[in-house]
Design a protein with these regions (language model features):
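Aliphatic-rich helical/repeat scaffold segments used for oligomerization and domain docking
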Residues: 1-246, 252
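Phospho-regulated, Ser/Thr/Pro-rich intrinsically disordered or coiled-coil terminal scaffolds
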Residues: 42, 382-383
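Inter-helical turn/loop elements of alpha-helical hairpins
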Residues: 141, 163-348, 352-380, 406-420, ...
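Intrinsically disordered, low-complexity acidic/Ser/Thr-rich segments used as protein-protein interaction/activation
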Residues: 267-269, 346-347, 383-398, 430-436, ...
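Solenoid-like repeat scaffolds
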Residues: 340-343, 427-432, 467-475, 507-516, ...
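Generic helix N-cap/helix-start motif at coil->alpha-helix transitions
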Residues: 398-400, 439-440, 477-481, 517-523, ...
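A conserved active-site cap/scaffold subdomain adjacent to cofactor or substrate pockets
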Residues: 481-496, 525
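C-terminal structural cap/anchor segments
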Residues: 540-546, 555-565, 585
Length: 654
């Protein structure tokens, strides 16, 4: 009764709940079984019909519903009867409006409602009046959670109105107008007009309406041309929302329905091919069709002379090649990008190229060059003036540059600075609230550097966070990468069986799909796990596979570790006297690490060679190998490798 009175008084300041009215209100609430929604409908009607008329109308309805039966009316029938009563009281234009508003899956704006009801000019004023009336009658709700004016229907009312829409055979026409409205809303925007954080949030709010429009468009009763255009136009919103799997699935469906005679503009065709080609980098779907799609997108961009699009598509090609271990090709793409960046004329584009070059160099091995590239971006990067350079995805270039700077610093032997930069990259990413940037900071820097420095607690926490992001955004790439990192963590903890099995499963999947992500590093971890189980032959085969992958694609930053581990495995096989082969591998690891400027890996190789010298009772030589390398370190003395080196030096006889 309090709900009824509050609602009635809100709509009619003269409403009185005293005297006989109180008993009438009680009777109405009893009829409605205390169902809040039904009570709101009835209270809303008192402002126009009066209390007695509402009570009488409901009495008549329920008398018909329960005539001939002694049982009480079920609660769902009570609500249905109330809805019928409220709907029948509406004038015909409002009935039609309510039916059509049910098309919207996630609320609507006035222009959207007007387009779905009737796309004729001048209809908005009539629709606005009708919506206001339906709000007054509690059939439509004003959405107060957004800055723009939106309304929605409660699901109970929407389901009821959809039934009515179907009964009037109006669903097909309404869905067509609905899909055409959203196609126009997004396709009419210039590709350089999206503003991340401003209208992107407004557009992602429409995602359920877009999903409904696309489902209809590609149905047997739909219009595939509308669906193809809408899919292509909505790509930036999917990327902004960090929904790569959905973007790939939707673009794949659109590509399968794309016909040569369709009226789809060249820029939108280009955008569709670009999205289809880029998304496998996040979803781990086959890489070769993705490269073909990007090649087609690049040709279209060149055809229309769109430099910004050429830049973005080349960036996509860099992503595909760098994440599939093709560092040679990735570096060549950065050279193409540099040429286009100069023509684009936006300084941030050139800095982005510098960041990509630094990433590629770091994976190839020259860590000082990689560090210089990353430091330059961290110091000088500013947000691009071209809006489209940020509309394609939520990446903060400074965050990613700082993450790669952290890796370069670790390889160079600056573990504490590396940990600081990794932490800063994550903090900056979290301030932007860009999930893609957060995920990259976690996978590239925080998790792996924690593993490399022996901070297993931080590694565990950051890998868990990476999994949470991968799950929330249905992003298989991060999930697979997270499981590889988890496998590496398990091996370091000594859980060899679980760790090597997890790595084996994930790397086998990656290989089948054409995505050997960070193969040399993860193959090294897997080989260590197999060695821990005593499966030396299989561990050696895994090392050889890692070295072959590094040689093929140019991802050589972990070659010193693979060479060192091969030497350790030779020693453990105990076939004859494997010292000579092990010495060669340890010496090769030292040479490669020194050439790359990887002091951290030089120390590991020196430790292995020094241990060998100890077993040969050549203690002075062991000290001569280890001391000069240990003395080059200026920080990180609490990390696992430096503790091991110090322990060995202290144990050697003087």
């Amino acid at each position: 009764m309090e709900l009824f009175i509050a609602r009635a008084e809100a709509l009619d300041s003269d409403f009185s709940s005293g005297g006989e009215n109180l008993s009438a209100i009680a009777a109405i609430c009893r009829h409605l079984d205390g169902i809040p929604l039904a009570i709101e409908f009835a209270a809303a009607r008192t402002a126009t019909l009066g209390l007695e008329e509402v009570a009488a109308g409901l009495r008549d309805r329920f008398a018909l519903l329960s005539s001939g039966r002694r049982a009480a009316v079920p609660r769902h029938r009570t609500l249905r009867t109330t809805l019928d009563w409220s709907y029948d009281l509406l004038p015909e234009p409002e009935q039609r409006l309510l039916r059509h508003l049910a098309i919207f899956a996630a609320g609507f704006t006035l222009p959207a409602a007007a387009a779905v009801v009737d796309d004729a000019d001048g209809i908005e004023a009539q629709v606005a009046y009708g919506i206001s009336s339906l709000v007054h009658k509690s059939l439509v709700t004003l959405d107060r959670s957004t800055s723009t004016t939106r309304w929605n229907l409660l699901e109970t009312i929407r389901a009821y109105a959809l039934e009515k829409l179907a009964a009037h055979d109006e669903i097909g026409a309404a869905m067509r107008r609905h899909a055409k409205f959203y196609r126009h809303l997004f396709a009419s925007r210039g590709l350089d007009s999206y503003v991340p954080g401003e209208d992107m949030d407004q557009f992602t709010r429409e995602i359920d309406n877009v999903r409904a429009a696309l489902d209809w468009s590609f149905s047997s009763a739909g219009d595939a041309e509308i669906g193809v255009t809408l899919t292509a136009a909505y790509v930036p919103a999917w990327l902004h929302a960090a929904l790569p799997t959905e973007c790939r699935e939707r673009t794949e469906r659109a590509m399968n329905n794309l016909a040569s005679g369709m009226n789809v503009s060249v820029p939108l065709r280009m955008q569709l091919h670009f999205a289809f080609g880029l998304m496998p980098a996040y979803t781990m779907s086959p890489v070769e069709p993705a490269k073909a799609a990007l090649a087609k997108a690049l040709a279209l961009a060149e055809q229309i002379g769109d430099l910004q699009a050429q830049f973005q598509i080349l960036w996509g090609l860099w992503v595909l090649n760098s994440e599939s271990g093709e560092c040679h090709t990735a570096y060549s793409v950065t050279e193409q990008l540099a040429l286009v960046a100069r023509r684009v004329g936006d300084p941030s584009a050139s800095l982005m190229v510098e960041r990509l070059r630094g990433f590629t160099l770091q994976m190839q091995g020259p860590h000082q060059q990689a560090r210089e590239c990353s430091e330059h971006v961290v110091r000088h990067y500013t947000a691009p003036t071209d809006r489209r350079l940020t509309a394609w995805g939520q990446f903060d270039q400074r965050v990613l540059a700082r993450a790669m700077l952290a890796r370069a610093l670790w390889f160079q032997g600056y573990a504490e600075q590396a940990m600081d930069q990794a932490r800063l990259s994550l903090e900056e990413a979290q301030r932007t609230n860009f999930l893609l940037s957060i995920g990259e900071a976690l996978r590239v820097a925080v998790s792996d550097i924690a593993l490399m420095t022996g901070d297993l607690e931080t590694a565990d926490q950051s890998i868990t966070l990476l999994f949470e992001i991968a799950t929330s955004r249905n992003a298989p790439f991060w999930g697979i990468f997270g499981r590889c990192l988890r496998g590496k963590l398990l091996v370091i903890r000594g859980e060899f069986a679980q760790g090597s099995a997890l790595l084996g499963t994930e790397l086998e999947f990656c290989e089948r799909a054409g995505w050997p992500i960070w193969y040399p590093e993860f193959m090294c971890a897997m080989a260590e796990g197999l060695a821990g189980l005593g499966e030396i032959a299989e561990a050696r085969a895994t090392v050889e596979k890692g070295l072959a992958s590094a040689d093929h694609g140019g991802e050589r930053s972990y070659c010193p570790e693979l060479l060192r581990l091969r030497g350790e495995l030779l020693l453990r096989q105990a076939i004859g006297q494997p010292w000579s082969g092990a010495e060669q591998d340890f010496s090769a690891a030292l040479r490669v690490a020194r050439r790359q400027g990887a002091l951290a890996l030089e120390l590991r190789a020196a430790l292995s060679l020094a241990r060998l010298r100890v077993t040969q009772a050549r203690h002075d030589e062991a000290r001569r190998i280890l001391t000069p390398i240990y003395d080059r370190f200026t920080e990180g003395f609490g990390t696992a490798d430096l503790r091991a080196a110090r322990g060995m030096l202290e144990a050697l006889p003087s």
